[in-house]
Structures are given as structure tokens and as C-alpha cells.
Swiss-Prot record:
Co-factor(s): [2Fe-2S] cluster; FAD
Record-level GO cellular component terms: plasma membrane
Name by which UniProt lists this protein: Na(+)-translocating NADH-quinone reductase subunit F
Entry keyword annotation includes NAD: yes
Native source species: Chlamydia felis (strain Fe/C-56) (Chlamydophila felis)
Length: 431
């Protein structure tokens, strides 16, 4: 009976501990309500009274504008890394933060330029906002499918109203709004093929509770490049990678949260409603006859597909187009069949797949692990297979999108070959 008594004591102690924790949490929340006085603040935009918004104090300027129907772009989700949520505060600007000083010149800071994601609304402000952001809109869409196309990447397919099409351009992006939610990663198996389960099980990624049920309205928005091209409307597509915590002993760190936006998207099922806003973007196609080289890795597949399918299937471009796509293994490769068909149908399109870590089954199926143009890091394979053979590499346009290390390696490589930065179109959300 001794061990039963001990177990009983532990259970009672655990219950008491949980109750105390709940009481303390409640006290903290109530204290915040009482101590932090919330008051209305007016945001006057472009000196136009009709655009004035009244918001509650205490929130970020970015979330206040988003809640007011002004979809300021924030591709990084408000982490101050993309530097795209810039707003000019002509009256009422507080002292700049270090993130502002790292973004703007001294003169710009004096003029009132700030990152809206880092600016707290505490009083009335007069703002200058670009017209293109004021003209951005929001759409409600219905999830058609949300299947994994790689172990940690989903293809989110959404249908929007054909009566109100989204006027986006290839290379553009939309922001996805994230409501309060709670999810269990085991439920994600519903939209994940069994072939991807083993890696998730190996890293103990299933049965993880992600609780963002107290998420503040308008506080979470993340921009994602469109994988679709305009002719595919009213359907839009995204390739989205899950942001897991770092792994410790083959398990996600319990002290670091999962990505708020990507976890929400991974939880979506067919029939669910989502809200997108935009369109935004700077990494559009340069309309000239220069040959094109796409250097794409991982979930950068969105950016590459949107441009390439639009050029070939919609615009019937005769420009020379080469795609180098890097993945770990064939299981992680995205849109292979689609690109192989395009290569057969269009003599001006050339497709190169590079694997950095081919699996045993890949090699058994015929993948050449000894060919450095096929089994390598993408930037090295590209240099061996094409770049080093170009007589005038500066004559090409390079469209680059992928993980941070991929992007930095490509930029350094192209710089070594004398390619001007103006010839490189980088889609980088500051991840």
C-alpha cells in the first residue's frame, strides 16, 4: 500500500500545483487589465479625415492597421526581419528602437519612418501610407486541399470567389490572417500521406499540443509566395513549410514554440475558411529578352512555379528558361512530374534536379550519387553544370528563392562570377 499512498500524494500535489498555477495566471491577467489603462487613439492617414481610424492603445501599429482593414505587408509575421512594414509617422512618432536604427537612415528616422510591427500605439498619430497598400484588399477563401508535398511542406490549395478575382502577378505574395486556434499535430495526419509519417514519428512531432487560443486579433499575419499563376484563378496555391522548434534528443524543444502561422496552416482541412489579403510583391518578372535561370530550394518552389508556368503556359514565352531545383531526396522533391512534362513540351525550358541527401531507395531506383551535378548542394551543382560554362554570366537574369543558407550561397557564388545585384531577383522573407 506504500506505493499507492505515494502515488495518491503525488496526484494531490500535482492537482494543487495546477490549481495554484491557474489562480496565478488569472491574477496576472486581471492585474494587466487593471494596471494597463486602454484608451482610444486616432490614426490619421495621408491627412485624409475619411481614412482616420480609431484604435485601442497598447497594440502594435501593424496589428492596429490590419484590424482597421489596412493590410500593411509583413512577410516575416512581425518579427522585424523582412523590414517591409515601413510606415512614416509624420506626427506622434516615438523615439526609434534599435530595429528602426538598423533599418532606416538617420534622415529617414528624423522624418518619422518606423517599422510598424515594432511601434506601440500609445497616442494619436498622423501617418503616411503608400496608396498601393490602401488599395490592397482582403478575400475569404475555402480550403480545397492541404496535402503534404514533402515531409515538412504542404501545398495549400484555396478557392476564392470568381466574381472578385485577386489581381496578383507571378512572383507576388498574399498575407494569411491567423485567428485564435488550438491544434494537436496528430490531427494533421488527415492531410499527410503515410510516407511522411516516419520522419514525424522519429522526431516525436505527433501528439504535440499547440495552443494559440488566446491569440490577439490581428496580431498574427504571415506572407507566403503564391505557387499558382493568374490563369489558375479562382484557385490559388501556396507551398508552406512548418516552423518546428529546434530538435533536442530527437524531439522538439518544449521551451520554444512552434511557428504560429505555419502551425495554423498545417491544421487546415478541406472546407475550412481562411482570409488572405494583398496582393503584394516586388520580385516580378522583368519583361525583356534576357535568358532566365531559376535557382530554387525547398518551399521556394512556390516562387519558381508561379513564374515558370505563367511564362510557358500563359504567355508562351520563347525566352530561354532554366530551373535548378534543390531537395534533400526524391521524397522531398516538389512538382517533378509537372516540370518534366514542361521540358518535353517546351524546347526553351530546361530542368535540373539536385539532391543533397539521396535516400537508399533513390539510389536503388537509378539516382547517380557520384554525379556532382546531381548529388550535391544546389549552388555547387549549378556552378559545375552551367555557371562555369557561361561565357557571359552577367547577361542572364537570376531568380532566387529558398532557405536562408541557400540564398546566401547563391548570392555569394554569383558575386564571385561578376553578376551585378541588379540581375538577381531575390524572394527573401527574412526567415
Amino acid at each position: 500500500m506504500t506505493w499507492l499512498s505515494g502515488l495518491y500524494f503525488i496526484s494531490i500535489a500535482s492537482l494543487v500545483f495546477c490549481v495554484i498555477g491557474l489562480i496565478l495566471s488569472g491574477v496576472i491577467l486581471i492585474s494587466r487589465k487593471l494596471l494597463v489603462k486602454i484608451h482610444p487613439c486616432k490614426l490619421k492617414i495621408n491627412n485624409d479625415d475619411s481614412l482616420t481610424k480609431t484604435v485601442d492603445s497598447g497594440h502594435s501599429l501593424l496589428s492596429s492597421l490590419l484590424d482597421s482593414g489596412i493590410p500593411i505587408p509583413s512577410p516575416c509575421g512581425g518579427k522585424a526581419t523582412c523590414k517591409q512594414c515601413k510606415v512614416k509617422i509624420v506626427k506622434g512618432a516615438d523615439q526609434p528602437l534599435e530595429t528602426d536604427r538598423a533599418t532606416f537612415s538617420k534622415r529617414q528616422l528624423e522624418q518619422g519612418w518606423r517599422l510598424s510591427c515594432q511601434t506601440k500605439v500609445q497616442h494619436d498619430m498622423n501617418l503616411e501610407i503608400e496608396e498601393r497598400y490602401l488599395n490592397a484588399s482582403s478575400w475569404e477563401g475555402t480550403v480545397v486541399s492541404n496535402d503534404n508535398v514533402a515531409t515538412f511542406i504542404k501545398e495549400l490549395v484555396v478557392s476564392v470567389s470568381p466574381e472578385h478575382p485577386i489581381p496578383f502577378k507571378p512572383g507576388g505574395y498574399l498575407q494569411i490572417s491567423v485567428p485564435a486556434y488550438k491544434t494537436n499535430t496528430s490531427d494533421w495526419k488527415q492531410t499527410m500521406a503515410p510516407e511522411y509519417h516516419s520522419d514525424w514519428e522519429r522526431f516525436n512531432l505527433f501528439n504535440q499540443i499547440i495552443d494559440n487560443s488566446l491569440l490577439e486579433s490581428g496580431s498574427a499575419n504571415k506572407a507566403y509566395s503564391l505557387a499558382s499563376y493568374p490563369a489558375e484563378l479562382p484557385v490559388i496555391k501556396f507551398n508552406i513549410r512548418i516552423a518546428t522548434p529546434p530538435f533536442i534528443n530527437n524531439a522538439p524543444s518544449p521551451n520554444i514554440p512552434w511557428g504560429v502561422c505555419s502551425s495554423y496552416i498545417f491544421s487546415l482541412k478541406p472546407g475550412d475558411k481562411i482570409t488572405v489579403s494583398g496582393p503584394y510583391g516586388e520580385s516580378f518578372m522583368k519583361e525583356n529578352n534576357r535568358p532566365l535561370i531559376f535557382l530554387i530550394g525547398g518551399a521556394g518552389s512556390s516562387f519558381g512555379r508561379s513564374h515558370i508556368l505563367d511564362l510557358l503556359l500563359d504567355k508562351h514565352s520563347t525566352r530561354d528558361i532554366t530551373l535548378w531545383y534543390g531537395a534533400r531526396s526524391l521524397k522531398e522533391n516538389i512538382y517533378q512530374e509537372e516540370y518534366e512534362k514542361l521540358e518535353k513540351d517546351f524546347p526553351n525550358f530546361h530542368y535540373h534536379l539536385v539532391l543533397s541527401e539521396p535516400l537508399a531507395e533513390d539510389i536503388a531506383s537509378g539516382w547517380d550519387k557520384n554525379d556532382p551535378e546531381k548529388t550535391n548542394f544546389l549552388f555547387r551543382a549549378f556552378e559545375l553544370g552551367q555557371l562555369s560554362k557561361l561565357s557571359n554570366p552577367e547577361d542572364y537574369l537570376y531568380y532566387v528563392c529558398g532557405p536562408p543558407l541557400h540564398n546566401s550561397s547563391i548570392l555569394k557564388l554569383l558575386d564571385n562570377y561578376g553578376v551585378e545585384r541588379s540581375s538577381i531577383i531575390l524572394d527573401d522573407f527574412g526567415n
